[in-house]
Every structure is written in structure tokens, then in C-alpha cells.
UniProtKB/Swiss-Prot annotation:
Keywords for this protein: 4Fe-4S, Iron, Iron-sulfur, Isoprene biosynthesis, Metal-binding, Oxidoreductase
Species of the source: Alcanivorax borkumensis (strain ATCC 700651 / DSM 11573 / NCIMB 13689 / SK2)
Gene name as annotated: ispH
Record-listed (2E)-4-hydroxy-3-methylbut-2-enyl diphosphate binding positions: H41, H74, H124, T168, S226, S227, N228, S270
Pfam families: LYTB (PF02401)
Known function: Catalyzes the conversion of 1-hydroxy-2-methyl-2-(E)-butenyl 4-diphosphate (HMBPP) into a mixture of isopentenyl diphosphate (IPP) and dimethylallyl diphosphate (DMAPP). Acts in the terminal step of the DOXP/MEP pathway for isoprenoid precursor biosynthesis.
Protein name in UniProt: 4-hydroxy-3-methylbut-2-enyl diphosphate reductase
Length: 311
């Protein structure tokens, strides 16, 4: 049985930066360091940081006065930012710069008097943060759509002054269809020159397409609450492969491998490489050959740390 590795896979620049911010804050200030929401959506990473002294909370009222708090890579609403400022909490913002770019877009659209439509998944923290960055005091509103049916049902105030943005971790193909539906329904709508789906999401989806063509089974290393990891599994299935999302190698079932000449392995943008290597070792113990990496797009993007945390 061949083992084929997706390229690229695993950590993206935004995840690297967010984890580095928590680790560096622990080094500089010592524990505890409070983090609003899981800094990235990976159980393995979160547990490792928790053992080092990070305290994960869902809301700021759980953070003591005079504490240090880190905002997760998914971003936060304006209300959360203002609450932290009012309480004079020391904040380090681990929001991915590509998410911040989307925030800047909805802030600008609100000031221009445009209503905004966000393509995204309800309940995801990135979506909640972006929705909360739109300033309704300018008279407009922001609407969430997940699919074409939502576009059909949507009612806005002024179809001539509309803009759209997207969550950064969506399916590229699904998002393209929703954007087409928006343009057909609202011909005057404007949006970013390129959709807001980030480079890492796009690259990992392209790699999975190739993997699914070569392998009857695709294993995606990632946690169930990771949006981009779920999109990778769904895409592999659409491309004709059997696919599973796994948090760790112990979840692999030998029955999945029965009759498979090749198995593909990839990882979501918040899954560490050492988990991938553990999965490969397990597959080899179950009869797999040495892993072979497929050709892919090189990534060399790095995002800078907050000044106060730089060595």
C-alpha cells in the first residue's frame, strides 16, 4: 500500500504566528496567560499550550482584572476589543492578518454606507468576529449567507449599495458558486479583487484534489471544530475518494485500508506535522510503504510578531 503525502499541508503562517504569540507570552510573562477561545482549532495544540500554562476562556468576563489576554487567530468583534480596552487588560492580538484584512473591508464598507454580505458558516468564531466589526451606526447592516439558498432568501435595504466578503477557510468551489449567485441576484454588488479565502486554504484544497485522484482513501489530520480541515475531507469525498477526519493515529481503523492500493494523508492548517508523522508511522505498521510527497506549491509567507513579544 502506497502512502502519498499532500503538499502543502498543516500549519499556515497565521497559525504559526498565533501559537508563537502564546508561547512567547508564556516565556516573557510566565503563566497564567489567558487566551480568548482556542487559539487555533486543534485539540493537540490547545492541550499542549494548556499544559504550559495557557488558560483558555470563551468570554472576557472569565479573565481576571490586570491579566494578560490573547485573542485567538480567528479574530474578535469590536465589542470584545472595546471591553478589553475598558478593563485595561493587556492584550496581544493573535488574529491572523488575513482575517484582519477582512475586518478592514467590512469597516470600510460600513463607513461608505454600504451594507455587507458575509459568506461563512454560522457560529464559527471568525464569522462572529467579522460580523461584529461592521459598524451599524452608519445606518447599514451585515448579513450572513452560507449557500445559494440563503442568497435567494436574502432581503437587503438598498441593492445598489452592497458589498460581500468571505470567511477565510471556506471551500473554494462552494464559495465561487455563492459569489456567482450574489452577482446574479445583486448586479451592483462589489467585493474584494480576489475572494478572501486565504492562500493556505486554497493551496491545501488544490493539494487534496490531486491526492484524491491518486488515492482511494484520504486521511485528513485535524480536529472536528476546524473549518478548513472539514472542507478538506468534504473535497476529497467530492473528488471520489473515501475520506476521514482524524485527530490522532489511534482513530485509524484497519478496515478503512482493506483493498486500498494507495492512501493519501494531509493535514488542516491548524494540525502539527508531528501528528502527520505519527499517522504515517501507524500506516506503515499496517502495511504501508515509505511515504512519498506529491509535488506542490511552496509556501514561504511569514507574519511578524507583536513588537512587545519579539526577542
Amino acid at each position: 500500500m502506497q502512502i502519498r503525502l499532500a503538499n502543502p499541508r498543516g500549519f499556515c503562517a497565521g497559525v504559526d504566528r498565533a501559537i508563537d504569540i502564546v508561547n512567547r507570552a508564556l516565556e516573557v510573562f510566565g503563566p497564567p496567560i489567558h487566551v480568548r477561545h482556542e487559539v487555533v482549532h486543534n485539540r493537540y495544540v490547545v492541550e499542549d499550550l494548556r499544559q504550559r500554562g495557557a488558560v483558555f476562556v470563551e468570554e472576557l468576563h472569565e479573565v481576571p482584572d490586570d491579566a494578560i489576554v490573547i485573542f485567538s487567530a480567528h479574530g474578535v468583534s469590536k465589542a470584545v476589543q472595546e471591553e478589553a480596552k475598558r478593563r485595561q487588560l493587556q492584550v496581544f492580538d493573535a488574529t491572523c492578518p488575513l482575517v484582519t484584512k477582512v475586518h478592514m473591508e467590512v469597516i470600510r464598507y460600513a463607513r461608505e454606507g454600504r451594507e455587507s454580505i458575509l459568506i461563512g458558516h454560522a457560529g464559527h468564531p471568525e464569522v462572529e468576529g467579522t460580523m461584529g466589526q461592521y459598524d451599524k451606526s452608519y445606518g447599514g447592516d451585515i448579513y450572513l449567507v452560507e449557500d445559494e439558498a440563503d442568497v435567494v432568501a436574502l432581503t437587503v435595504r438598498d441593492e445598489s449599495k452592497l458589498a460581500f466578503v468571505t470567511q477565510t477557510t471556506l471551500s473554494v468551489d462552494d464559495t465561487a458558486r455563492v459569489i456567482d449567485a450574489l452577482r446574479q441576484r445583486f448586479p451592483a454588488i462589489i467585493g474584494p479583487k480576489r475572494e478572501d479565502i486565504c492562500y493556505a486554504t486554497t493551496n491545501r484544497q488544490d493539494a487534496v484534489r490531486q491526492l484524491a485522484l491518486e488515492c482511494g482513501l484520504v486521511l485528513v489530520v485535524g480536529s472536528v471544530n476546524s473549518s478548513n480541515s472539514n472542507r478538506l475531507r468534504e473535497l476529497a469525498e467530492r473528488c471520489g475518494a473515501e475520506a476521514y477526519l482524524i485527530d490522532e493515529p489511534s482513530q485509524i481503523e484497519a478496515s478503512w485500508l482493506k483493498g486500498k492500493a494507495a492512501v493519501g494523508v494531509t493535514a488542516g492548517a491548524s494540525a502539527p506535522e508531528d501528528l502527520v508523522q505519527q499517522v504515517i508511522a501507524t500506516l506503515k505498521n499496517l502495511g504501508g510503504e515509505d511515504a512519498e510527497e506529491i509535488p506542490g506549491r511552496e509556501e514561504n509567507i511569514r507574519f511578524s510578531m507583536p513588537k512587545a513579544l519579539r526577542p
